[in-house]
Amino acid sequence: PVQNVFEATLNSPNLVIHLAASLLNLSKMESSPDFRHYRDGLTPGVFRLLEAMEEEKQAVMSGMGYTYVRSVDFLHSLDQPSLALFRELDGPTGLSHRYLTEDAYAGVNLMTSLAAPARGQTPIAQALVTLASALNQTDYAQEGLSLRTFGLEGRSASEINDYLETGELRI
């Protein structure tokens, strides 16, 4: 079990994988009608960026007092027959795909806003949100889910966790 909804959100593998890999594969996505994210898009260079995202996620989760679960390990075994479904999933097909829109808006943006109370740094995640914002002409940092969205901006990690567990903000 997880402590709260933020811990569950941060432990989603999508947060680490979707936005980063999609941005690095944008030209392939737009030019290849047969592009498959998990078959075609996970190159050694992409894995390096995913590992950097893992480090940022781990720092934020540790600072928030959450249990950290690595996201990218299963990707190294995608050639296993039991994971064939992942390799054949379509797309993403372009900028409006949920791997770019939802993950910039929700998971990755939330992680960047948790960096301050967690005393962590998220320059890679912030850069990904900035790139997705420019490409989709949407300011995900302002419009996306963040501590500000939930009225928790400026709160400490313990105050945030308290609120998520009790529904009460203590002054």
PLM regions: where:
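Long, low-complexity C-terminal extensions of enzymes
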Residues: 73-171
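Small-residue-rich helix-loop
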Residues: 46, 52-88
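Short, solvent-exposed coil/turn linker segments
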Residues: 4, 36-37, 70-71, 156, ...
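Short, surface-exposed acidic
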Residues: 1-2, 65-72, 122-125
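Alpha-helix N-cap/loop-to-helix boundary motif
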Residues: 41-53, 70-71, 96-103
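Residue-level recognition of short, structured coil/turn motifs
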Residues: 16-18, 65, 119, 137
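Substrate/ligand-engaging "lid" and interaction regions
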Residues: 1-49, 53
